[in-house]
Amino acid sequence: FSTLVRYGVLAAFQALWAGPYLMEVMGYSTLATGNLILLLNFGMILGAPCLGTLSDRLFRTRKGVVIAGLTGILLIIIILTLIPPGIHLAVLALLFFCFGFFNAAGLLMYPHIKEMMPLEMAGVAMTGINFFNMIGPAVFLQGLGSLMQALYPDASRGPEAFNAAFKMCSVCLVTATTLYFFTREKRLDR
């Protein structure tokens, strides 16, 4: 469930909703919007090796780093519901970079789940994660759009609609993070 939510929120935000949110609600140009979304991707690119190193060498836990990443994503979504239009671009740049960085923790779900399974079941485990990774965007892209349209039919791309979508993402992330606390973990003895 956690991989469905994490990647669903990321894909819905990055691929569809970040652009209209930044241009129509926050009032930024297409160039600034594109650069902010690019920063999100840079955050993910840099986050993957950093969080992998933290997981493998420093903390020796995948579960803990994933939970920290999910919590970071949640905090950023909550901040996005609170910031006013016209906030300084540097604040959004930091938030978008961190959103990508913390989302990179989701990549640790793959080895976390794989290490819990017997070797002969590793392929099935990876198939399960990939399945839920792909279902997440399908659910969140359509679901958030439908929610925004249903709650605000005349202003489905207005500030209130985006806040409702962000709040729904927050509820899902709280649930996913809470459930992830209950996953088992094989100790990393490296």
Language model region names:
Residues F1-P49, Y110, P137-G145:
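Extracytoplasmic gate region of multi-pass secondary transporters
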Residues A48-R60, M148:
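Helix-to-loop junctions at the C-terminal end of transmembrane segments
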Residues R57-L70:
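Cytoplasmic membrane-interface "Motif A"-like loop-to-helix N-cap segments
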Residues T71-P85:
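C-terminal ends and interior cores of transmembrane alpha-helices
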Residues T81-P84, F166-R190:
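Multi-pass alpha-helical transporter architecture, strongest
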Residues L89-G106:
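Hydrophobic core of transmembrane alpha-helices in multi-pass small-molecule transporters
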Residues P118-P153:
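A late C-terminal transmembrane helix in Major Facilitator Superfamily
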